[in-house]
Amino acid sequence: MTRQCNCSEGSCGSGRYEELVLERMLYSARLKETVARRDSDVIAAMATMIAETFRNGGKVLLCGNGGSAADAQHLAAELTIRYRSSVNRPALPAIALSTDTSALTAGANDLGFDEVFSRLTEAYGRPGDLLLGLSTSGNSPNVLKALQTARKLGLKTLALLGGDGGTIRPHADLAVVVPHTGSADRTQECHIAIGHVIVELVESMMGYA
């Protein structure tokens, strides 16, 4: 239903705001289409690596900052609980490293914020596990150090990034880089869409869907 503006001469600016809505949402859709057409094989390969990790008794660690921390927690919850209510399956072990405020603040205070995720990766990660790092810039120092630590410990590494992939990209076994710069929002929208597809694929690959 189209709602008409009742103000005189459209002085509320609703037309301008409607144009902004259209512009933002269409750009977001085009960005997702670009990533889907370019990286569908990489996204499927990421899901395969995660499914193999679970089949072999490993767990998935996830990390990111700000909105990316929220995305990491979001995806960890869908792996641990389930993605869709129509799927009945066992819990899958996934841990978002941004959820323990005591550990995060102790690490930031004692070691520095750049070290918080690497320290938790050292604590929880074991050979055969997998770390997924999220960074809209591709340059988050604490995510970078977590992936470096993960590799040293024998974990597989995945990354969802933005821009040109930044300093993190070379440290991921597989990475999807969203070609957007200047703000985190559109990149995060792509990351969560990719994450949802990955979780759906993992459930299917493991025979649950």
UniProtKB/Swiss-Prot annotation:
- List the record's Gene Ontology CC terms alphabetically: cytoplasm
Gene Ontology molecular-function annotations: carbohydrate derivative binding; D-sedoheptulose 7-phosphate isomerase activity; zinc ion binding
Q: What is its main location?
A: cytoplasm
The SIS domain, residue ranges: 50-209
Q: In which residues is substrate bound? A: 65-67, 78, 109-110, 135-137, 140, 188
Keywords (A to Z) from UniProt: Carbohydrate metabolism, Cytoplasm, Isomerase, Metal-binding, Zinc
**Which PROSITE patterns would you find in this protein's record?**
SIS
> Has the keyword Zinc been applied to this entry?
yes
InterPro entries per record? GmhA/DiaA (IPR035461), Phosphoheptose_Isoase (IPR004515), SIS_dom (IPR001347), SIS_dom_sf (IPR046348), SIS_GmhA/DiaA_subfam (IPR050099)
One of its GO biological process terms is: D-glycero-D-manno-heptose 7-phosphate biosynthetic process
Q: Which residues bind Zn(2+)?
A: 74, 78, 188, 196
Name what cofactor the protein needs. Answer: Zn(2+)
Superkingdom of the source? Bacteria
Its annotated compartments are:
Cytoplasm
Q: What is its EC number?
A: 5.3.1.28
Question: Which reaction does this chain catalyze?
Answer: 2 D-sedoheptulose 7-phosphate = D-glycero-alpha-D-manno-heptose 7-phosphate + D-glycero-beta-D-manno-heptose 7-phosphate
- Which pathway is this protein engaged in? Carbohydrate biosynthesis; D-glycero-D-manno-heptose 7-phosphate biosynthesis; D-glycero-alpha-D-manno-heptose 7-phosphate and D-glycero-beta-D-manno-heptose 7-phosphate from sedoheptulose 7-phosphate: step 1/1
**Any further remark recorded for this protein:** The reaction produces a racemic mixture of D-glycero-alpha-D-manno-heptose 7-phosphate and D-glycero-beta-D-manno-heptose 7-phosphate.
Listed PANTHER family:
DNAA INITIATOR-ASSOCIATING PROTEIN DIAA, SEDOHEPTULOSE 7-PHOSPHATE ISOMERASE / DNAA INITIATOR-ASSOCIATING FACTOR FOR REPLICATION INITIATION
* Family indicated by similarity: Belongs to the SIS family. GmhA subfamily.
The role this protein plays is: Catalyzes the isomerization of sedoheptulose 7-phosphate in D-glycero-D-manno-heptose 7-phosphate.
The entry's protein name is Phosphoheptose isomerase
Gene assigned in the entry:
gmhA
